């Protein structure tokens, strides 16, 4: 899988016969299979298909965006004409989302003119021939009149199907997304260039390629998505096993997805060497579930799309045939009854708009023994709230940037967000409101609710938790009150995240609250600029000017400090963290912590010798790493290796049998007086997807966090999680003379749990706090000389009074009616202050005061010799 490309090319075969003196040369062309393309060959092939397209259809190539390394993300579109695309995007799609009942009536009356998009997609770029299948299908639909394939009916009888492409284009628009990961195609990688898996990121959306694809999916809302993967030898075609996510309207999609999968499987088998296929929902009891929106195919199901992951068996021409014909079999199924497909979609949207909770959807939600468990309502009469409110007011304990980011997130994902236009009960004007009476309420709820506890199941495929509010650190409240905000919602007008907006000019310093990732970014920016940054027990101390300079770029919360810090200042930190190595894929990948820390402004280095701090997240280290630098051990894999090495006497990392990938979000209790827990409250949360805890704490080590004694498990998949009560999850101490921090969870997993990043950054910055000394403000001058402008006679000095309220950040200039400029009287970066921690200072005199004196709180009017005259007060 990693090395086959090394053999591609022309190779000379030389045969000699010494007796006869004969030499025979033959050139052998090595290619993986007949329809194989390199990335560059694929780009050339799709351009050629466009150029050779039939004149009776519209064939386009669209660049959706750029990959992380700057490669184009290409998508082919085949439609009847431009009018078909325009009508779908401007009429059919928006009407379906907002007025599905009207479309249902027209559909029933046979008066509805519509076309449905179909998306053929690849996520994992090295799972060839996936990309080649899409490349070949694009050529077929662009340049051919008909396409014929063999298949069988339900009884196994052989038959031949011919699809007339112009006829298909009367009902469908075909989208060919050649690959989500062009970097991976060029470099022969399954993962993105940063080592992260795009097929776990469809809901997290931390990567640019994924965000681009998600935006495209929600632009088109295709009726079906065929996501070509490899390699499952049994030739796997979804739908998936239970547990199914309760936010689906699964009963509307289930039968259609099963029928579609059978049509695909029968066509794939009939045209290849393979003699069978499997459908996880029918053939496996668990372990290939659709409870997580991170998979591209499953993500589609949340939006009423027939989403299918297709796992071809091998990387060869036979799998090319199987995958290609499976997609053709799926298209044939769609073509048999498009009205039925559209009816399903419209009913899906209608349930959201009408806030319908149909019992039939609950009947699809089963437990491990097949029993119906339905939607967990926690004592309420219904599952879906009427609204979600995301507060946008300034709040020290709310990550304002992450709250603000949800505006773009929901827009990208087709969820409507409004803004509260007046205070209503505890909710404030300007708060974001998601009215759940909308087409995509299921996905909105999936992102904002706590999540489900699927610990009763014996197996799950990967992560389960999404829960953006808890995982990313912003507040969100479900509201069960129908009509509460009627007439009070409008379009979102806020253009940036909330942050401190007033600065006290008397405060020499500010404390940046350590309650957001933005705070860490801002602090690293200040350190990089050579500013003095001090550590305190609840944040970072910077001088007032530095704080003001950070506010335009960072959504941070600051408290005025009327003290003077003394002690060590923070320095730029270099971090070393060994890569992961995945034997099954034959690749290395960066530690997730490295990716996160780089975004937060830390420098990542390649050796421990270069580093200031070592972070161990994988098991790729030995005993020699310890005792040289402050070290962090993060997650179950690294903890198990630490115990195995035996270098930390008395340390015991524990897990349940088979539990190395158990996942859970839990309530925890921390030592909130320790600097390493800065920014977190005593009753907090803990997240892990590596199933470990600390059973024994070494002597002289301090316990920083433990799971709560009861009622602690919130969501995830952690069988027998009842054993976790009071278990230790974080400790600190020293090993071989260096600080050692051990954290059992995974605070940077796939870059999603932003709220937990600061467990890592706290340990990096350490616990050497500044001491605080009294601040002695400089004595104000007795007088301020204000020059008189626009005078024809000799001006005389005028005494002016200086008010000292809070000073707002710079505002726009105001202009009077006669167009004379009057500058808003605001604080400016660089306004001086005097600090006197060590010795008394002589008071400044009026002679040292500059003529450019910044006044605030009153208007200085200068026109035709008129002045406001005030006497200076001595404080």
What label would you give each PLM region?
Residues 71-78:
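A short loop-to-beta-strand scaffold at the N-terminal edge of the catalytic core in hydrolase folds
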Residues 862-875:
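C-terminal membrane-anchoring or membrane-association module
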Residues 779-855, 874-875:
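Intrinsically disordered, low-complexity repeat and linker tracts
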Residues 1-51, 62-64, 72, 88, ...:
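Intrinsic-disorder/low-complexity accessory segments
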Residues 198, 676, 842:
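Short clusters of hydrophobic/aromatic residues that line enzyme substrate/ligand-binding pockets
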Residues 96-258:
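Active-site/substrate-binding loop(s) of hydrolase catalytic cores
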Residues 57-62, 77:
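Mature N-terminal segment immediately following signal peptide/propeptide cleavage
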């Amino acid at each position: 899988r990693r090395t086959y490309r090394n053999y591609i090319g022309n190779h000379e075969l030389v045969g000699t016969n010494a007796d006869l003196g004969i030499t025979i040369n033959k050139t052998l062309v090595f290619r993986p299979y007949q329809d194989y393309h390199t990335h560059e060959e694929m780009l050339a092939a799709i351009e050629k298909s466009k150029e050779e397209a039939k004149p009776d259809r519209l064939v386009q190539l669209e660049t959706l965006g750029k990959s992380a390394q700057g490669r184009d993300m290409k998508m082919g579109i085949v439609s009847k004409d431009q009018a078909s695309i325009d009508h779908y995007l401007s009429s059919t799609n928006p009407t379906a989302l907002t007025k599905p009942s009207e479309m249902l009536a027209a559909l029933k009356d046979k008066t509805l003119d519509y076309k449905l998009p179909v998306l053929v997609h690849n996520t994992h770029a090295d799972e060839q021939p996936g990309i080649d299948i899409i490349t070949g299908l694009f050529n077929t639909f662009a340049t051919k009149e008909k396409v014929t394939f063999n298949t069988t009916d339900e009884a196994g009888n052989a038959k031949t199907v011919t699809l007339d492409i112009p006829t298909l284009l009367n009902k469908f628009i075909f989208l060919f997304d050649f690959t989500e990961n062009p970097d991976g195609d060029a470099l022969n990688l399954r993962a993105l260039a940063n080592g992260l898996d795009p097929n776990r990121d469809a809901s997290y959306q931390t990567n640019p390629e994924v965000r681009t694809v998600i935006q495209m999916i929600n632009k088109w809302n295709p009726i079906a998505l065929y996501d070509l993967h490899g390699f499952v030898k049994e030739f796997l075609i979804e739908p998936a096993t239970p547990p199914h996510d309760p936010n689906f309207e699964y009963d509307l999609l289930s039968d259609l997805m099963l029928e579609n999968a059978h049509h695909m499987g029968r066509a794939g088998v009939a045209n290849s060497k393979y003699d069978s296929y499997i459908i996880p929902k029918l053939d496996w009891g668990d372990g290939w579930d659709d409870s997580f929106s991170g998979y591209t195919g499953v993500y589609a199901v949340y939006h009423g799309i027939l989403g299918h992951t297709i796992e071809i068996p091998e990387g060869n021409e036979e799998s090319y045939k199987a995958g290609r014909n499976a997609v053709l079999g799926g298209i044939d199924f769609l073509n048999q009854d498009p009205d039925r497909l559209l009816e399903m979609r419209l009913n899906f949207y209608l349930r959201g708009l009408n806030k319908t909770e149909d019992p039939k959807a609950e009947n699809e939600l089963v437990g491990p023994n097949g029993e119906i468990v339905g939607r967990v309502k926690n004592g309420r009469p219904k599952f879906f709230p009427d609204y979600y409110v995301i507060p946008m007011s300034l709040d020290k304990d709310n990550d304002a940037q992450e709250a603000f980011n949800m505006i773009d997130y929901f827009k990208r994902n087709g969820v409507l967000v409004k803004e509260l236009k007046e205070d209503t009960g505890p909710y404030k004007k300007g708060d974001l409101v998601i009215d759940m009476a909308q087409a995509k309420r299921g996905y909105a709820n999936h992102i904002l609710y706590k999540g489900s506890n699927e610990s009763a199941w014996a197996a799950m495929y990967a992560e389960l938790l999404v829960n953006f509010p808890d995982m990313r650190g912003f507040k969100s409240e479900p509201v069960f009150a129908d009509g509460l905000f009627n007439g009070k919602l409008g379009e979102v007008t806020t253009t940036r995240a909330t942050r401190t907006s007033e600065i006290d000019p008397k405060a020499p310093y500010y404390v940046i609250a350590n309650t957001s990732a933005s705070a860490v970014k801002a602090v690293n920016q200040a350190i990089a600029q050579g500013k003095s940054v001090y550590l305190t027990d609840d944040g970072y101390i910077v001088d007032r000017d530095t704080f003001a300079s950070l506010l335009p770029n960072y959504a941070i919360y600051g408290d005025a400090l009327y003290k003077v810090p003394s002690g060590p200042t923070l320095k730029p930190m270099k971090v070393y963290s060994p890569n992961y190595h995945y034997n099954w894929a034959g690749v290395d990948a960066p530690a997730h912590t490295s990716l996160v820390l780089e975004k937060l402004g830390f420098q990542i280095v390649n050796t421990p010798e270069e580093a200031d701090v070592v972070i161990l997240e994988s098991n790729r280290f030995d005993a020699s790493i310890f005792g040289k630098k402050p070290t962090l051990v993060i997650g179950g894999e690294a903890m198990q290796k630490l115990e195995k090495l035996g270098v930390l006497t008395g340390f015991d990392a524990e897990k349940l049998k088979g539990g190395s990938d158990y996942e859970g979000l839990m309530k925890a209790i921390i030592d909130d007086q320790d600097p390493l827990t800065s920014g977190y409250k005593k009753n907090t949360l803990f997240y892990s997807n590596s199933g470990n805890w600390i059973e024994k704490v070494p002597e002289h080590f301090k316990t920083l966090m433990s799971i709560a004694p009861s009622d602690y498990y919130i969501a995830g998949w952690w069988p027998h999680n009842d054993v976790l009560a009071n278990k230790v999850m974080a400790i600190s101490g020293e090993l071989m003379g260096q600080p050692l921090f051990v954290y059992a969870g995974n605070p940077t997993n796939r870059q999603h749990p932003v709220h937990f990043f600061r467990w890592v950054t706290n340990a990096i910055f350490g616990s050497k706090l500044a001491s605080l000394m009294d601040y002695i403000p400089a004595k104000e001058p007795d007088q301020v000389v204000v020059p008189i402008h626009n005078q024809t006679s000799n001006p005389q000095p005028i005494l002016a009074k200086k008010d000292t309220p809070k000073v707002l950040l710079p505002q726009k200039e105001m202009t009077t009616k006669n167009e004379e400029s009057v500058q808003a009287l605001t604080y400016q970066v660089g306004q001086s202050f005097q600090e006197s921690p060590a010795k008394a200072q002589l008071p400044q005199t009026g002679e040292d005061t500059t003529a450019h004196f910044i006044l605030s709180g009153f208007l200085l009017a200068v026109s035709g010799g008129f002045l406001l005259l005030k006497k200076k007060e001595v404080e």
